[in-house]
Amino acid sequence: MFNHGSLFSGIGGFDLAAEWMGWNNVFHCEIDPFCRKVLHYYWPNSISYEDIRNTDFTVHRGTIDILTGGFPCQPFSVAGKRRGTEDDRYLWPEMLRAIREIKPEYVVGENVHGLLSWSNGLVLEQVLSDLEAEGYEVQ
């Protein structure tokens, strides 16, 4: 059985998929209070973290097989102001810090299509480069 942790968990899409796969949902991290209530309802035995910016994930180093997450999309979404890396909600650096602290075997990420075109793809290139620098094969 794989151990799974989720970042920017929302109402638990990745957590539900992990459960369907038979994985153990060890923790989730979500700042929105309503979403945390949903997560607690469905996964009461999972550790719940609120704010990725204030969470030390080193306690999970070497124990998480698969880490999932999609850092907030508002900075890149065509529906928003598209402030990109200047937006306070640009949290890729925090997700990268969590990856470095946890060192999971696999990382599964998702984001909006607008990330592909933001700054001619430079943000996506940075994300991919950061993951490769940590030893991950990016596909």
What is each model feature region?
Residues M1-Q139:
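Conserved active-site and SAM-binding loop architecture
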